[in-house]
């Protein structure tokens, strides 16, 4: 089976059948998500309860937690012995083991680490970056985006996706500027205060012959950085704008070929 947490929580069987999660109460889904966020690391019952309930612990939080884990096991792996569950009882707590269930968050993290081991621009590095883009249909734990336990994995996925989009956009500028522009635009949407994606969008738009569009990307960058953060675009971005303007002027001044 495979659990997905990038975006909304989902579970599929080995044959690709999607399991309905309507029978799991919200607290049970939260328990599953916390275990997924901390996969392959045993969690004490107190730590899990603190993540799920915070200061609003039920009267007997240990019993409540045990009930929800039992419900998760019965719902997602009916008929399977507890000893074979992907949620393993260990050291008085529980652990989501990726040896018994796939997890998209773990796959993304592995792809990011593997990509970093290859040199910039290498085909294998770009293939792994593309895999990250395919996996990260959205940031993880969308139903609990403001939960403290979700903050770290959400930030990690955002950064991994930003790097993947940026590297893929940079690689495509010359060969496929339209794709490069789409990827750069996605990177800007993901982090409007990161400057390199704006530079990539400017380069891609210019490569498409859309000079005005390229300059509008600079204006968006300037608005995000100057108006909202109080800092100007970098000298590199300003120089890129100047180069685009100069090339537009040269194109306008070029003589029209005789008929």
Task: Specify the residue positions occupied by each region the protein language model found.
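Intrinsically disordered, low-complexity protein-interaction/activation regions
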Residues: 1-182, 186-192, 257
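Recognition helices and adjacent regulatory flanks at domain boundaries
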Residues: 163-164, 168-258
